[in-house]
Amino acid sequence: MIRTTLLLAAAAVLIPAAHAQTPLDPCTLLTPDQIKAVLNSPVEPGQPGVAKGSDECTWGDANGDDRVYIALRPAADFHTFRKQIEKNGGQVTPVTGLGDDAFFVSPDESSSALYVLTKTHLLLLTVTPPDSTQQQVQAAEKALATQILPKL
């Protein structure tokens, strides 16, 4: 009886651990070469956020200017972010063909942020190429997102 109880307890501990999702390192989702191919501008290797196990990564150029930023959040945050952005007067533009749902937020005429919902994650992606229009920024964000999404 004790042996059976111990076996069941061990199974209860081990089974959820086997199904637990391994946290993704966002800095492994893109390479400097992938970014350079989209931006026509070289970048340094990605740098994780300051917190240990950060869900953020930033790629900058040799001058220290940030060029690409990604953050991974739980998928459940997607609708909360969207509602908060809309509540604060942000312009949300739906995007088709990416993930389960996606939208751009454009705070001004030359910048943008892309939010993409997958089954398990919210991907936030911003791209700041040198001397680019908002349309070029959004095209770059979509291009990089299509390279990231198969890894999520």
Give the predicted meaning of each segment.
Residues 4-18:
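Sec-dependent N-terminal signal peptides
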Residues 21-23, 93-152:
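A short, solvent-exposed beta-edge/loop patch
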Residues 37-109:
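Short, solvent-exposed recognition patches
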